[in-house]
Amino acid sequence: NREVPLSYNDIGEFSKKRCPFNHPCVMFKKTAVEKAGGYKETYHLFEDYYLWIRMLQTGCQAQNLPDVLLYMRTPNDMYKRRGGKEYATSMLRFHWWVYKSGWTSLLDFCTGALPHSLVCVAPTTIRKIIYKALH
């Protein structure tokens, strides 16, 4: 099970380096999404994370539940899809925006996005080990 922060403050801090929500179980008010500018495909493969950062920036109150709401299997190709030059480039562009938007510091960018980019270009077998350790 992927552990995510529960409180609003912890979610905000965690979101500076990693996505603070488990995607399939997210619920939100339509008005909160609209206030943040809606769903945009600006950062390929990071569309949801991009929306959630913008929602947090507009003051949207967020909370995770401690309960497991959904069990998911990891498809065999997931670790391959989370790597490569295109994924790394998109991830770096997204995290650079997070920094430029004022949500994070340059230190957060350097200690979050840069190591993540190394994981992206690592061989799939190494990436799988790292993802399993983090989740």
Tell what function each PLM region has.
Residues 1-85:
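Conserved nucleotide-sugar donor-binding catalytic segment
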